[in-house]
């Protein structure tokens, strides 16, 4: 095995782990929840620690820092939404990451009482079925109660930067 980024560090520090895991390209999601169907009650945050868990039953998982307000909000509401962002939604991602950039206007679509971002490629409205402590994060497992998806190119995050996704090979799905 050759090393290109430097020598092996025998100590696994949070910074080194973050840098290593940042080399795993991921989609970008906005996790949302609300106390009621009112845009003033919406709480959202950018997250890329999201994964599918099971197709039957339909389960997904999002990992939220225990220091984040979102962790408490999800526990209080028992629901959350996942909006998988399209390639042109970097300003929205920055907004929900707490950056100074403000998108022109954030609009929501409500599905099963859960706010989801207009213009996203995918909407998943979830009910929390389990929450597991995991170090400095909580793993919130959600049952997908309703979904919606569209075609388009996703927003991708790699090594701390947003990227575009270029298709390689044929532009045909694998049968799904």
UniProtKB/Swiss-Prot annotation:
Group of enzyme by EC: oxidoreductase
InterPro entries: Flavin_Rdtase-like_dom (IPR002563), NADH-dep_flavin_reductase (IPR050268), Split_barrel_FMN-bd (IPR012349)
A biological process term (GO) from this entry: 4-nitrophenol catabolic process
EC numbers on record: 1.5.1.36
Chain residues that bind NAD(+): 52, 137, 157-160
Key word NAD present: yes
Stored Gene3D superfamilies: Electron Transport, Fmn-binding Protein, Chain A (2.30.110.10)
Annotated positions binding FAD: 39-46, 48-49, 63-65, 69-70, 95-96
pH dependence, record text: Optimum pH is 7.5.
Record's catalysed reaction(s): a reduced flavin + NAD(+) = an oxidized flavin + NADH + 2 H(+)
Induction / repression: By 4-NP in the presence of NphR.
Superkingdom field: Bacteria
Keywords: FAD, Flavoprotein, NAD, Oxidoreductase
GO molecular function: FAD binding; flavin reductase (NADH) activity; FMN binding; NAD binding; riboflavin reductase (NADPH) activity
Database matches in PANTHER family: FLAVIN REDUCTASE, FMN REDUCTASE (NADH) RUTF
Function, in words: Catalyzes the reduction of FAD with the concomitant oxidation of NADH. NAD is the physiological electron donor. Subsequently, the reduced flavins diffuse to the oxygenase component NphA2.
Family indicated by similarity: Belongs to the non-flavoprotein flavin reductase family.
Record text on subunit structure and interactions: Homodimer. 4-nitrophenol 2-monooxygenase complex consists of an oxygenase component NphA1 and a flavin reductase component NphA2.
Protein name per UniProt: NADH-dependent flavin reductase
Organism: Rhodococcus sp
Gene label: nphA2
